Amino acid sequence: MDASHAVNVERFIFLGSNCIYPKNCPQPIKEEYILTGVLEPTNSAYAIAKLAGIELIKSYRKEYARKWISVMPINLYGPNDNFDLESSHVFPALIRKFTDAVRNNSKTVTVWGTGKPRREFLHVDDLSKAIILCLDKYDSKEHINIGTGTDLTISELANKIAEISGFNGEIVWDSSQSDGTPRKVLDIQKITNLGWKPTITLEQGIKSTIEWYLENK
């Protein structure tokens, strides 16, 4: 941010995360629910860093009259994601596990947790369009949510990816692993009022991401 300020960048977007919201937050999550409860312990350090970024944006706006903004996207996925099973998020991890299982003719796929938590996913191309819209139409010190407004269980997601990838074996749930936050779905009224809405369905996104992974990994 200091470097951008030094060269007089007029429009700057801080890309935050839905992790800024409390673990047991009312659903759907409105922007004003920030700092109203305890964060999810497993990623609190990451969330605190994002919260600090939001405050920095507010400070630059106040002190230097910068037209800088903060956006909070939900879980993202798509081409060029991190598919490393040791460090990836749930969506790319499931893409890799099921496509690799089909390649290797494996009969089972193990997935962490119980499959019960509910999550919301947004394709990165839809995020790009939302960011461009915000650069043009949004100018506020308050952050803005970007998501789809709909969610599903991790179990439902796993079954969709299994079906689209062609996996016909058994899904084994490892309940010894943490489920994390029970539910995350964003209230996206602010951004829909600006004229934006997601255009890529989950099924379309899964299919195109699998195709990208198979061609590039």
Place the predicted regions along the sequence by residue.
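C-terminal substrate-binding subdomain of Rossmann-fold SDR/epimerase-dehydratase oxidoreductases
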Residues: 100-217
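Catalytic helix-loop patch of NAD(P)-dependent Rossmann-fold dehydrogenases
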Residues: 6, 11, 19-77, 81-87
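A secondary-structure boundary/capping signal
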Residues: 16-17, 72-73, 148, 187
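Proline-centered turn/helix-capping motifs that create local helix->coil transitions or kinks
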Residues: 13, 19-28, 65, 99-107, ...
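Conserved active-site helix of classical SDR/Rossmann-fold NAD(P)-dependent CH-OH oxidoreductases
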Residues: 51-58, 62, 91-96, 128-129, ...
